[in-house]
């Protein structure tokens, strides 16, 4: 049981440290066991990788790697946001093309949002518009929150092909077809999938939001790794959202969006009104109830305490606050500009007991009852809650194929963030999953291999965690010391001496007992030398004591020390001498009354010398 308890403690310590690593992103574990990253074998350092700009292997609508080092084809917005001050309404956020801060792949660059707390907007035209018909839509790109993220987004907008789209005027209200990507503020982590659906009768566009993903998104915002975001929308009205090529959300456009695509068949009649005689009161005051005669509604809730007395030393004429006598007028004070200077007020030190007009404290009025109200009873005329009648929805429609959205012709990023250095790379829009997968293999997977090759070992990770949390050093020491202590206690067990209860007197106590008995006998015999009967009677108690002690000592365990054995031998000899002396004295007493002194005295002398 002892080893089981220690093992349990070790397990709890390991779980605690491991959970701490997970929270800090020191070593983030994949949320799926079938991770593609787990299949990537250990590679050498990033300096041995040969990067080649990804090339699409099939038909695409848009690709961008930023490896050229310039923003050719991209247009910075010059628009201003509506309903905002001109100073903060402009899109003046800065964009740069840079390599990753960590785990760089030589030659691989990306688009980086550089400004903090500014509006950013940039867009590029597709090679050809995407028309929703009979081909899937696949949108894929990479994001790395290099400095983490406090509040901001990294989503993209697929701008609607309206015919009058001007990218320099791109702003938050520009018409889009799909908005997709990560967004975070506070502790709210989101992965947006929003599309604008056109009402076939009214022509009004309405935003439809896909249900939230089924996984915890926090690690993708905090681990400072490059993650791959993929959206797949199929002509059969199904969709999938993937992170790092693993599905995190899926469903249908008809059933898994809010609000629903199709409106209700019936709606409340807007012209229907509740009848005046409709009684929807579930409870009413009891009409038969009468206010009691002694009910006084005029009594106040609180009254002055008539038993209160003004404390002695209360100063009625003293103010509670006085000007600070130590305050001085500032040198730069101008009476013309600042007005007449007045010293700040402080509590009056003379008002320790109280100052000003004294008033007795207020107490609850025992006679107070308040306004009388009759008790409530069930309404006999209750008709229930009224609701308007239903009528057919004049705007009802049934869209069985919501995949047929408005075509789009440009991709844009319209973002605001409190954290800079958000990295974007390897955009692709296509219709074939194989094309997108190969694009990810040539770009994103290479970043992952470099990151894995540069990943610190277990010991280094433990040191990094302890540098951020010094208390982990103590846990490491405990975890390292416990196995050593267990091995030591198992291999070199401590010798436990068996303790016996000391039932007999010690050697010194035995000697004292014998000496005391002998002295008492000697004193009594000197007082009455002519009475051998008394000597015999007095000798018996001493003999009994010696015999008793002897029995107790003999009853001890055999594991006695040498000293104990010597004590036993001495006790036996003393007992024998005592017995022989007693017998001799008895015989001498029978022969002559005066002959018992010499043997007794010699016996005492011999016993004392023996001790």
From Swiss-Prot:
The modification Phosphoserine is found at residues 561, 578, 580, 582, 592, 595, 602. The modification N6-acetyllysine is found at residue 128. One of its GO terms (cellular component) is endoplasmic reticulum. Detected in testis (at protein level). Detected in testis. Sequence repeats lie at residues 267-280, 284-297, 303-316, 322-335, 339-352, 356-369, 370-383, 384-397. Disulfide bonds join 151-185, 351-355. One of its GO terms (molecular function) is calcium ion binding. Residues 493-611 are cytoplasmic. This is Calmegin. It comes from Mus musculus (Mouse).
């Amino acid at each position: 049981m002892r080893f089981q308890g220690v093992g349990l403690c070790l397990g709890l310590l390991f779980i605690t440290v491991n959970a701490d690593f997970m929270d800090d992103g020191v070593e983030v574990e994949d949320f799926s066991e079938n991770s593609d990253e787990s299949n990537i074998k250990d590679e050498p350092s990033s300096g041995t990788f040969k990067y080649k700009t990804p090339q699409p292997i099939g038909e695409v609508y848009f690709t961008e790697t930023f490896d050229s080092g310039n923003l050719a084809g991209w247009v910075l917005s010059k628009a201003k946001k509506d309903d905002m001050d001109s100073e903060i309404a402009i899109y003046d956020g800065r964009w740069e093309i840079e390599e990753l801060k960590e785990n760089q792949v030589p030659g691989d660059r990306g688009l980086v949002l550089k400004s903090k707390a500014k509006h950013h907007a940039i867009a590029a035209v597709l090679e050809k518009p995407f028309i929703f018909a009979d081909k899937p839509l696949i949108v894929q790109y990479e994001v790395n929150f290099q400095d983490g993220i406090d509040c901001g987004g990294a989503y993209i907008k697929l701008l609607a092909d309206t015919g009058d789209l001007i990218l320099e005027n791109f702003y938050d209200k520009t018409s889009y077809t799909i908005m997709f990507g990560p967004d975070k503020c506070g502790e709210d982590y989101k992965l947006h999938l929003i599309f604008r659906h056109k009402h076939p009768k009214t022509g009004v566009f309405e935003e439809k939001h896909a249900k939230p993903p089924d996984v915890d998104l926090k690690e993708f915002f905090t681990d400072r790794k490059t993650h791959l975001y993929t959206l797949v929308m199929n002509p059969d009205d199904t969709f999938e959202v993937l992170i790092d090529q693993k599905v995190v959300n899926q469903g249908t456009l008809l059933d898994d969006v809010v609000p629903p695509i199709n409106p209700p068949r019936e709606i409340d009649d807007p012209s229907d009104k509740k009848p005046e005689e409709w009684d929807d009161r579930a409870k009413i005051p009891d009409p038969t109830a009468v206010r009691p005669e002694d009910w006084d509604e005029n009594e106040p809730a609180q009254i002055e305490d008539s038993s209160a007395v003004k404390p002695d030393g209360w100063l009625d004429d003293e103010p509670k606050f006085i000007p600070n006598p130590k305050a001085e007028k500032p040198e730069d004070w101008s009476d013309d500009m600042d007005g007449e200077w007045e010293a700040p007020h402080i509590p009056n030190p003379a008002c320790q007991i109280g100052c000003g007009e004294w008033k007795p404290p207020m107490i609850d009025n025992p006679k107070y009852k308040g306004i009388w109200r009759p008790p409530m009873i069930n309404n006999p005329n209750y008709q229930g809650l009224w609701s308007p009648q239903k009528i057919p929805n004049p705007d009802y429609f049934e869209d069985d194929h919501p995949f047929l959205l408005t075509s789009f012709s440009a991709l844009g990023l319209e973002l605001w963030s409190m954290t800079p250095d958000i990295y974007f790379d390897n955009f692709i829009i296509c219709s074939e999953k194989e094309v997108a997968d190969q694009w990810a293999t040539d770009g994103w997977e290479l970043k992952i291999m470099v990151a894995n090759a540069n990943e610190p070992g277990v010991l280094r990770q433990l040191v990094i965690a302890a540098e951020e949390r010094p208390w982990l050093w103590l846990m490491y020491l405990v975890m390292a010391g416990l196995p050593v202590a267990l091995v030591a206690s198992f291999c070199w067990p401590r010798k436990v001496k068996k303790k016996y209860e000391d039932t007999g007197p010690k050697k010194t106590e035995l000697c004292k007992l014998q000496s005391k008995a002998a002295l008492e006998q000697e004193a009594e015999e000197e007082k009455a030398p002519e009475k051998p009967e008394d000597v015999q009677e007095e000798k018996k108690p001493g003999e009994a004591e010696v015999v008793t002690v002897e029995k107790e000592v003999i009853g001890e365990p055999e594991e006695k020390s040498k000293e104990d054995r010597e004590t036993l031998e001495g006790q036996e000899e003393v007992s024998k001498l005592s017995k022989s002396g007693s017998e001799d004295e008895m015989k001498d007493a029978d022969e002559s009354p005066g002959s018992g002194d010499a043997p007794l005295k010699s016996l005492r002398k011999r016993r004392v010398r023996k001790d």
